[in-house]
């Protein structure tokens, strides 16, 4: 993959670095998406800030990277599965791609982050997600201590319920 020197969205220099084992800041995927800083990591993969290079807007990039099945990332950014885990790595990689392609078909459903693209590269899969900004629920709760009235909670979470219902309609189960 190529590497950009600055963000195509805001022009800011890519001076920062991501931790070892993650994609380097400035990596370009499919000639269209630039990887920014790592936001979080979980057992399924890594979440990065990103930018769409043509329309120059922000995106979030979710990379398939199952920690328990991945041995390393090569110097060329290619994921290498652990010895003996090759079949499971490939199967779960295909499941990850299928999941995000399914969500892409039902978005924009209320309450779901739109999946703009699914890119396969580096022996991995990247879900390119709409980045609307906003405040994560844990931060909102931290800034608004105390009890939330049930009616207010239902109003706030209604889009989430609708998104999960849309997923269930096509046979996806939220875990």
Model-derived segments and their meaning:
Residues 51-58, 65-69:
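Conserved N-lobe loop of protein kinases adjacent to the ATP-binding glycine-rich P-loop
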Residues 121-136, 140:
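Conserved short submotifs of the Hanks-type protein kinase catalytic core
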Residues 156-157:
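Activation segment signature within eukaryotic-like protein kinase domains
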Residues 16-35:
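A short, low-complexity linker immediately N-terminal to eukaryotic Hanks-type protein kinase catalytic domains
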Residues 36-42, 47:
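Protein kinase glycine-rich loop
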């Amino acid at each position: 993959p190529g590497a950009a020197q600055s963000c195509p969205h805001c022009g800011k220099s890519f001076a920062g670095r991501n931790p070892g084992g993650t994609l380097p800041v400035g990596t370009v995927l499919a000639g269209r998406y630039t990887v920014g800083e790592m936001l979080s990591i979980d057992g399924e993969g890594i979440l990065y800030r990103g930018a769409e290079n043509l329309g120059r807007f922000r995106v979030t990039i979710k990379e398939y990277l199952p920690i328990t099945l991945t041995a390393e990332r090569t110097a060329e950014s290619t994921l290498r599965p652990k010895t003996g885990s090759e079949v499971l790595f490939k199967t779960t990689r295909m499941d990850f791609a299928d999941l995000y392609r399914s969500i892409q078909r039902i978005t924009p459903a209320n309450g779901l982050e739109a999946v703009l693209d699914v890119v396969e590269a580096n022996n991995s899969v990247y879900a390119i997600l709409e980045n609307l900004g906003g405040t994560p629920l844990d931060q909102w709760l931290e800034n608004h201590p105390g009890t939330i009235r049930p009616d207010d909670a239902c109003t706030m979470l209604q889009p989430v319920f609708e998104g999960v219902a849309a997923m269930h309609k096509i046979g996806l189960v939220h875990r």
